[in-house]
Amino acid sequence: MDELNTLSWVLLGLGALVVGLSKTALPGAGTLAVVLFATALPARESTAGLLVLLIVGDLFAVWMYRHTVDWAILRRLIWPVLAGIAVGSVFLGLASDDAVRRVIGAILLTLLAFTLWRRRRGSTMKPGRLAGYGFGWLGGFTTMVANAGGPVMSLYLLGMRLDVKTFLGTAAYFFFAINLFKVPFQIGLGLLDLQMLSIVAVLVPLVVVAAFAGRWLASRIPQRAFEALVLVLTAVGALNLLI
């Protein structure tokens, strides 16, 4: 903790606030937290610290939407997601810090481009079983390597044309289960240790405050404007990671 400067703490604090907001009000905004954490900490270690905060945020989302879950979708995704997590774990164990940082940046830019393309195309086609396997695998890999599975799975759930509450409930349980599953991998890789937990402990209150603030802000901030801001900031951050 002594090695972190003031700017690093500011970036981590902002990232913690974004985590809380993304779980209770603004799905998809979590990619900005990925950028902030990977900028403030070594890229590989940043995934472990962010994971703990995501689980804290997941607890709020699970409690709020515990009665609206499409269990059939979750059962369909489980095996491809687990395969993606396994591949991502091997990659984290073999890749250098610079490689992980660049992969995080490339993944975020790719997801942003795909999101914008889907919006521009205005496609309403419901993803088939093969697409579900592909989204599940990529979601598992990206969530293990960069905690960036949110945009992938959000696109898939949106494509399934779920109503808002079912979407939020299904996503809440999905990410809570997946994030818990990733903890032993992070410990085994030596990324989640007591030093990282001591840093995260300082940030947990910010996640809690932002989670409650998210419920209050959700009906007051123009969704389109905020989503556009998140996309722009994430793109700038991802480019910074690639340079």
Residue ranges and their predicted role:
Residues 212-233:
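Interfacial loop-to-transmembrane junctions
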Residues 9, 48-51, 105-108, 112, ...:
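Residues within membrane-spanning alpha-helices of integral membrane proteins
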Residues 46, 88-93, 101, 141-148, ...:
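Hydrophobic alpha-helical transmembrane segments in multi-pass integral membrane proteins
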Residues 58-68, 89, 103-128, 215-216, ...:
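Transmembrane helix exit motif
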Residues 35, 89-93, 155, 215-216:
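Small-residue-mediated transmembrane helix hinge/kink sites in multi-pass secondary transporters
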Residues 8-75, 136, 140, 150-211:
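Small-residue-rich hydrophobic segments that form or flank transmembrane alpha-helices
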Residues 71-81, 103-107, 126-136, 166-173, ...:
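Cytoplasmic-side transmembrane-helix entry/capping segments in multi-pass membrane proteins
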Residues 1-3, 90-99, 186-198:
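Membrane-interface helix termini and inter-helical loops of multi-pass transporters
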